[in-house]
Amino acid sequence: MTRKLFGTDGIRGTANTDPMTAEMAMKLGMAAGRHFTRGDHRHVVVIGKDTRLSGYLLEPALTAGFISVGMDVVLLGPLPTPAVALLTRSMRADLGVMISASHNPYEDNGIKLFGPDGFKLSDEDELTIEASMSNGLESCRVGSDHLGRAKRLDDAAGRYIEYAKYTFPRGLRLDGLKIVVDCANGAAYKVAPTVLWELGAEVIPVAVNPDGFNINKNCGSLHTETMREQVVAHGAHLGIALDGDADRVVLCDELGHMIDGDQLMALIGDLWHRSGQLKGGGIVATVMSNLGLERFLDQRGLKTIRTAVGDRYVLEHMRRDGFNVGGEQSGHIILSDHSTTGDGLVAGLQVLAALVQSGKPASEMLRLFTPLPQVLKNVRVAKGSVAEVLAAPAVEAAIRDAEAKLAGQGRLLIRKSGTEPLIRVMAEGEDEGLVEASVDAIVETIRRAAG
């Protein structure tokens, strides 16, 4: 049995259209609530969200579903995804819910679920919940005297702020550092600038005025132009860009040059190795990470384990094999000594600690290896047609041709997005011209096949 609703990062879609409707959210609340009402204690679910307008559609629907099966609901308001995971654990909740579509535009929304341990649910849990949504929900409603209750946690943001500061080494401060932080008009718009300011930095906030529509719009980790411009204009030491739910981060140095997740994993992995903190003898990355990262770590006697794309798969390998550093090139950085999921702010704080301790500028500290030329392009196709397009004879022929040209000189990766109707085409190799030509040829063929 395969999941139909749940993708690689929960349920996602265009808000107020199937499946991302209030009706679905209420059914999800009932089914997930029933699945996690084990034991005879009072059952609790915490719900956080980002700043999308449609959060007001989904939050009350989920709340109604949970209350109807006897679960108490604690509403956290706008908070980063890792904060929801943290509070699920610290409040001894049975379940955590984050309403967010991460880096997607405001029209989309999504729902991620966390178990009582703060980790994302297993495939098996998601399958069980999905099956329950299709049948048998009437029987799980409780009587009116056993309905759950809802309350808002007023100090939720403050709890996460204290936790984030706790991950920064004691005795260090950010005095004298000027930092631009782009919060994507998203979930971290209050907490990220506050954490940096409380640690002593001069903070230049960008995209901290959410209006329900501007999340990720020309800002955040996918649109870094403003952050880079502000870093150069203000003479800042570092730029930090988060995405809409702040579970991913990218940086730029004082010159405005970008630092992606691969460079961050190289830095943290190397530093933690030298300090004896690194576990597993290396890091866990995905198939999208640059070969330059692997070569850099190999030179230091460290291994690189690769997984399918998606932070859930990275985390699965980390937990199974005992690693404590992992992530994605896109900026999902998982530091399991601190978090149960990707945490952009906490990852950024580890980099800032390294900068303070070294006394070097970011341009010297954060570019540890030269990446091989890599080109990634996305092709949007009609929903539900990805497999059909990839199976088209012309597309298969274009892929075979590119593979033949890159043989021995690079690699090619074609995959469908787990969260959007996109086909991602990536090539990497020593010859930049060949890499770009290979990707362009496949992208053009996919576009023709998609009509």
Curated annotation (Swiss-Prot):
One of its GO terms (molecular function) is phosphoglucosamine mutase activity. Its EC number is 5.4.2.10. The active site is at S102. One of its GO terms (biological process) is peptidoglycan biosynthetic process. Activated by phosphorylation. PROSITE patterns: PGM_PMM. InterPro entries: A-D-PHexomutase_a/b/a-I, A-D-PHexomutase_a/b/a-I/II/III, A-D-PHexomutase_a/b/a-II, A-D-PHexomutase_a/b/a-III, A-D-PHexomutase_C, A-D-PHexomutase_C_sf, A-D-PHexomutase_CS, Alpha-D-phosphohexomutase_SF. The modification Phosphoserine is found at S102. Binds 1 Mg(2+) ion per subunit. Its cofactor is Mg(2+). Keywords: Isomerase, Magnesium, Metal-binding, Phosphoprotein. Gene3D superfamilies: Alpha-D-Glucose-1,6-Bisphosphate, subunit A, domain 3 (3.40.120.10), Alpha-D-phosphohexomutase, C-terminal domain (3.30.310.50). It catalyses: alpha-D-glucosamine 1-phosphate = D-glucosamine 6-phosphate. Mg(2+) binds at S102, D243, D245, D247. GO terms for cellular component: cytosol. Catalyzes the conversion of glucosamine-6-phosphate to glucosamine-1-phosphate. NCBIfam families: glmM (TIGR01455), PRK10887.1 (NF008139). Belongs to the phosphohexose mutase family. This is Phosphoglucosamine mutase. It comes from Paramagnetospirillum magneticum (strain ATCC 700264 / AMB-1) (Magnetospirillum magneticum).
